[in-house]
Amino acid sequence: MDAEAAKMIGAGLAAIGMIGSGIGVGNIWANLIATVGRNPAAKSTVELYGWIGFAVTEAIALFALVVALILLFAA
């Protein structure tokens, strides 16, 4: 296998981390909407935790993107 093909395969595998992050963000917001629907008084508290969870989950996707780009262009 030549080096260019290995770089492409590695970048593709690193990008798989973004799929999991997308699923996680969807689950966070779906559960937040369901929780506020059941208990509207808890909206401010639940919304804060939702944004924190979103930020942490999205950071994982950004790390996966950075690794994929490093594998493509710097390795």
UniProtKB/Swiss-Prot annotation:
Disulfide bonds: none
Main location: membrane
UniProt cross-references to PROSITE patterns, sorted A to Z: ATPASE_C
Localization per Swiss-Prot or TrEMBL: Cell inner membrane
Transmembrane regions: 9-29, 52-72
Matches recorded under NCBIfam families: PRK07558.1
Role description: F(1)F(0) ATP synthase produces ATP from ADP in the presence of a proton or sodium gradient. F-type ATPases consist of two structural domains, F(1) containing the extramembraneous catalytic core and F(0) containing the membrane proton channel, linked together by a central stalk and a peripheral stalk. During catalysis, ATP synthesis in the catalytic domain of F(1) is coupled via a rotary mechanism of the central stalk subunits to proton translocation. Key component of the F(0) channel; it plays a direct role in translocation across the membrane. A homomeric c-ring of between 10-14 subunits forms the central stalk rotor element with the F(1) delta and epsilon subunits.
Protein name as annotated: ATP synthase subunit c
Lineage of producing organism: Bacteria, Pseudomonadati, Pseudomonadota, Alphaproteobacteria, Rhodospirillales
